[in-house]
């Protein structure tokens, strides 16, 4: 039956039939809905206030066992103030559209009713899997630090795992669809459009902004609109659609914190920046961010621009940013704008105070500023003007607690403006900073307790615990993606924490090669601490999950010490891609504090991490799925990957599967494949619908298969497949092709500009591998085939 629906949708998207006249159009508007029934052309249109068209070219059909009958002769009339009735005579049936406040209810006298239609689905109206209130309950918590560290208010919201495929997490690169996806999310309106679970939506390349929709009506069905989805359903404190015009994808940033802590020195930053410039800049890496440790006073207090440690940073901040920029990179800095130690004596009224007196010092050994005071805002404007003049382009704001709202004990009678709402005061401070540095500077908010009240001003938010440099330490990264990926690229970018890919290092060796503060921090979080680093399989899982979810790609490793095999993992997963979540719900914040690993190990830990990540791709490289299958346990496992059930693909089709990390074409599979995964490893499989002609199925450059390929085209008259790829100079580039039986290789050519490039090739069965050295200019490649029969 689903196969029939897909064929119907393809037909609808390609042609519209003119039907016999059956009366003038009838329009009914009620409860925000407008339905127009045009009997003359046999179509209906459905729109919704604030959303525009929801369904267009709606046709009424009756579905038999082997055929579909479109109703060609019907009449419509209004019933009361909120209904439209439709009656057909060939064949006889009756339909009713009832315009309810949050749903369009559709019913028919036939048990075989079927609506076929188009629904607008431009880039700002994305396919989605919505929260399922009938699924397993979990808790989304954004304030563990405020509650546990300061006795403050806890912010949390209920969420639910889906009943169907709770082990799969879906993402989109480009305008995609899937048979298991039945809803849309309108980014501008913060509204979801939910169809029935039996609905099939399909997108065709020639109609990228439209989805064909097939909606079974076995008696009745509903099309629901869920307004204020992020705020009222998910529990976000505010909703502002993310403007990605300056930052079209999540940034890639090296952060000094987890590998150096407050012991970081100028030489450490320069050494890592030089290494990034030499090894990763060509792959898209761009930011080098200095974290805490550059300005501490004798008691650990902070002065930010006032007192840089001259012993650790002898050349000062301007020299450092210039040095980073000279390498073609961008400089970033960590600070806590809500606190400052330099004005306690001169301006005591600048500070928040306890009801029992005394300045509030809750974090970073630094007193907290009163953001309702205009003089404080003037000070912050001067501070950020100076930082911007020094050349910083990336700002990590820590301690974003919004003390007035979430921390008890503040004496509200002693703040400058007693009438201002705490959230308004907090956002006014962020607004001033944003206006000072401009929209082209990146701000990472480290809420550490504030439930995302900075949405609209932050470009990203650090939404997890500080990671540390081991496999267990990376669980904070996985937990953050697991809990918060639904926010990514919709309201801000998710910064899940710094990733580490260093190889194993014993505790004894770490005491010699790492600062004491780093060793001590890890020992306090994990008992017993066996060492640092992780296996190659574990590192592969880290970079796979970060890259395929589209979150901020932040590194904390001592990069110059990485062996080539680890560097290769980074190169093959950079840069970040403009990925959107499909799953619009939290999978639960299940690790609030690091104490858990003092009593547990990852193998014992019960979590809701996905076993499969499914990135659906629609790009010049093709329309396909990237499935990452992860084994979280310490024993080898085999998982069954059902193409229809798990990935929402067509159950009747065959698929070509390419193993990205193994760089190997695995063959053609019909309905499923069994995937063997080593302990803590992730297999990444590119799954393409099988074509009758030669097709690109993978490349060596990027895990998505999409980044480097700018165009691909098949010319049947010439038996010629050609395309254009962006490559990295000096780095060997490989394309993998599937060649159907009966087709043989003729010639392979590659060129950059006017220069011919030597292209090597190897044929093994149906697999064709073509390699050539990377160039500064785009590489145009072509492959000519010969066929035993017409293609």
Predicted regions and their residues:
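Bacterial N-terminal signal peptides
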Residues: 7-18
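Carbohydrate-recognition beta-sandwich/jelly-roll modules
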Residues: 25-29, 35-287, 311, 394
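Solvent-exposed beta-hairpin/edge-strand motifs
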Residues: 131-142, 645-662, 738-754
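Carbohydrate-binding surface patches
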Residues: 167, 546-549, 554-556, 594-649, ...
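Solvent-exposed beta-strand/loop surfaces of large extracellular or lumenal domains
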Residues: 197-200, 652-672, 748-769
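C-terminal beta-strand-rich structural cap/linker in extracellular carbohydrate-active enzymes
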Residues: 223, 668-706, 764-791
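Aromatic-lined carbohydrate-binding/catalytic grooves of carbohydrate-active enzymes
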Residues: 250-254, 258-385, 392-415
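Glycan-recognition surfaces
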Residues: 346-378, 382, 424-564, 585-588, ...
């Amino acid at each position: 039956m689903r196969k029939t629906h897909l064929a119907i949708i393809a037909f609808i998207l390609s042609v519209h039939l003119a039907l016999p006249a059956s009366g003038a159009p009838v329009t009914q508007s009620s409860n925000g809905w407008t339905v127009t029934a045009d009997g003359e052309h046999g179509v209906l249109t459905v729109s919704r206030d604030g959303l525009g068209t929801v369904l267009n070219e709606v046709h009424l059909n009756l579905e038999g066992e082997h055929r579909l009958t479109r109703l060609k002769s019907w009449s419509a009339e209004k019933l009361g103030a909120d209904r439209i009735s439709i009656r057909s005579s060939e064949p006889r049936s009756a339909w009713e559209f009832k315009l309810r406040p949050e749903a369009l209810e559709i019913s028919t006298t036939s048990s075989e009713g079927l609506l076929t239609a188009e629904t607008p689905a431009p880039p700002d109206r994305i396919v989605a899997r919505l929260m399922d209130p009938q699924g397993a309950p979990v808790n989304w918590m954004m304030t563990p630090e405020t509650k546990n560290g300061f006795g403050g208010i806890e912010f949390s919201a209920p969420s639910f795992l889906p009943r169907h495929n709770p082990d799969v997490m879906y993402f989109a690169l480009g305008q995609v669809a899937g048979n298991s996806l039945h809803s849309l999310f309108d980014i501008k309106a913060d509204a979801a459009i939910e169809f029935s679970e039996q609905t099939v939506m399909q997108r065709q390349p020639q109609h990228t902004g439209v989805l064909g929709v097939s909606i079974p009506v076995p008696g009745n069905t509903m099309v629901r609109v869920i307004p204020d989805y992020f705020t009222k359903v998910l529990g976000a404190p505010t909703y502002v659609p993310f403007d990605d015009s300056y930052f079209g994808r999540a940034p890639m940033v090296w952060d000094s914190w987890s590998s150096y802590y407050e012991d970081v020195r100028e030489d450490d930053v320069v050494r890592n920046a030089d290494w990034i410039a030499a090894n990763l800049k060509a792959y898209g890496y761009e930011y080098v961010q200095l974290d805490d440790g550059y300005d501490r006073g004798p008691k650990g207090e902070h002065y930010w621009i006032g007192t840089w440690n001259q012993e650790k940073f002898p050349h000062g901040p301007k020299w450092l940013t210039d040095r980073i920029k000279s390498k073609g990179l961008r400089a970033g800095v960590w600070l806590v704008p809500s606190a400052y130690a330099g004005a306690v004596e001169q301006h005591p009224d600048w500070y928040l105070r306890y009801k029992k007196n005394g300045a509030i010092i809750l974090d970073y050994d630094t007193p907290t500023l009163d953001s309702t005071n205009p003089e404080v805002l003037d000070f912050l404007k001067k501070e950020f003007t100076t930082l911007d003049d020094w050349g910083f382009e990336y700002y990590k704001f820590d301690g974003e607690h919004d003390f007035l709202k979430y921390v008890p004990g503040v004496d509200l009678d002693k703040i400058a403006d007693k009438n201002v709402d705490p959230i308004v005061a907090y956002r006014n401070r962020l607004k001033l900073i944003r206006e000072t540095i401009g929209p082209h500077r990146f701000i990472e908010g480290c809420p550490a307790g504030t439930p995302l009240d900075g949405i609209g001003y932050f470009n990203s938010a650090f939404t997890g615990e500080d990671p540390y440099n081991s496999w267990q330490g990376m669980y904070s990264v996985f937990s953050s993606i697991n809990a918060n990926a639904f926010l990514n690229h919709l309201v801000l970018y998710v910064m899940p924490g710094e990733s580490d890919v260093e190889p194993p290092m014993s505790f004894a060796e770490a005491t010699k090669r790492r600062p004491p503060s780093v060793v001590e921090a890890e020992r306090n979080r994990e008992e017993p601490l066996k060492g640092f680093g992780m296996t190659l399989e574990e590192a592969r899982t880290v970079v796979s999950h970060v890259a395929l979810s589209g979150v901020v790609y932040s590194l904390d490793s001592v990069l110059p010490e990485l062996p080539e095999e680890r560097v290769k993992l980074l190169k093959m997963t950079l840069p970040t891609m403009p990925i959107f979540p499909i799953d619009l719900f939290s999978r639960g914040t299940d690790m609030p504090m690091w104490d858990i690993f003092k009593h547990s190990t990852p193998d014992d830990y019960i979590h809701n991490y996905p076993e499969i990540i499914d990135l659906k791709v629609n790009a010049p490289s093709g329309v396909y799925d990237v499935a990452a299958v992860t084994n979280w346990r310490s024993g080898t496992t085999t998982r069954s990957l059902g193409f229809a059930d798990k990935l929402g693909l067509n159950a009747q089709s065959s698929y070509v599967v390419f193993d990205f990390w193994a760089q190997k074409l695995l063959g053609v599979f019909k309905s499923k494949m069994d995937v063997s995964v080593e302990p803590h490893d992730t297999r990444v499989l590119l799954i393409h619908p099988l074509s009758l002609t030669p097709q690109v199925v993978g490349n060596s450059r990027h895990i998505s298969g999409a980044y480097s390929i700018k165009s691909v085209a098949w010319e049947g008259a010439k038996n010629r497949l050609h395309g254009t790829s962006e490559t990295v100079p000096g780095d060997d580039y490989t394309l993998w092709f599937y060649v159907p039986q009966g087709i043989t290789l003729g010639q392979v050519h590659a060129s950059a500009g006017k220069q011919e490039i030597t292209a090597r090739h190897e044929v093994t069965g149906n697999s064709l591998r073509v390699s050539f050295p990377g160039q500064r200019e785009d590489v145009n490649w072509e492959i000519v085939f010969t066929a035993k029969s017409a293609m």
